[in-house]
Amino acid sequence: MLRFVIALSLFVFLGILNGNSQTKISTDSIQNKMQWFADAKLGIFIHWGIYAVNGISESWSFHNKEISYPNYMQQINGFTASNYDANAWAELIKQSGAKYAVLTTKHHDGVALWPTSASKLNMFESSPAKKDLLAPFYKALKSKGIKAGTYFSLLDWSYPDYPGFLNDSSRYKISDDPQRWSRFLTFLNHQLSEIMEQYKPDLMWFDGDWEQSADQWDASGIRKKLLSYNPNLIINGRLTGYGDYETPEQNFPVSRPQFKWWELCMTTNNNWGYQQKDTNWKTPYEIISIFVDAVSNGGNLLLDIGPKPDGTIPAEQINILKELGKWNKKNGEAIFNQLGGIAQGHFYGPTTISKDSTTLFLFLQGKASGQIMLKGLENKIEEIEVLGTEVKLPYKIVGKISWSKVPGLVYIDVPENVLDPYITVLKLKLDKPIKLYNGKGGL
């Protein structure tokens, strides 16, 4: 993942997205294949690689010369995967409520988790693991009905024919040696073919496209090649403009992104891969509130975990996923297969809407009890239910004037004893598809 997140990344993100991949790929042409992704809402990201051995930054630590390249690569000798249980991973992902998972097949360091024939720099040939780490995981995912995603770094700082290496030096310029670059593209496409043929992913999650242009990568050619294997393959937005959806990283947009499909990828602590010293864990409440906010704004959350070099998942991450799963089991009706919510200003919190627009879900963050307010609702409310319970709530209309078209304020009484430990969800059944008033008040 990218580490050079700058203070103004939100503005950069919004600016880039306004002119990036969505301008090259027609949303109408991919509407059907994107439906499962739009309904899925939650994915689990897994960063697993040799960087977990010393607990250092994945790839960037040698690129930025925090550690020498030889010392970085020596970590491969400690990567055992001795306690790797792909079925247990898949079961945990299922328990979380996630509908898809993305595993790092190869990060920027070039170390492949599968026995690629294009390079000996893989876990099968060069590490004590001596096994294909992808096959059992994707088999386990598919057995549980979870969509399979493959993270793949376009750039490869270890491959001798790739120009980039350290942050202040490069091997060559593409313009000076186009044949060498051509050899790298052959290598790149060979590995992509292996992944598509052997693991048949549902989603390709690219990274590392920023070092070269779309023409240099032959991004349109890569897209065409991948879709020849699977026309329904979903491709993320890090293919220099030739992806299907956008991928903001770590920073949550303040306003709703103006894109058909988007996915926030975020860590459970401060780092993507396993780092023993990083104990700054997000709480289950923080994760759930971020998740709800993403869904309310029409997006997905791709939540990251970083297994240890032996394949065990840190206890803190297991707890986060299980708590998230408990909440999803109770409140999933308001999340999965629903649409992003109503415009800001009508309700001070996240919302979602059913696909037929006759049900509105309100998310009460924190310990919100007493009266909550909904503004501008022109519909009649047939029933208000606390999701996951059989409790029905009373409400009243305040300020409705008979001669004015402006609807009154809806006040809902929420007793403390119905509150969820994390986020309470109210289900409002409406008399017809939702209609909101956005005009002026008064005369």
Question: Could you say what each language-model-derived stretch is?
Answer:
Residues 22-443:
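Mature catalytic domains of secreted/periplasmic carbohydrate-active enzymes
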Residues 1-23:
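Bacterial Sec-dependent N-terminal signal peptides
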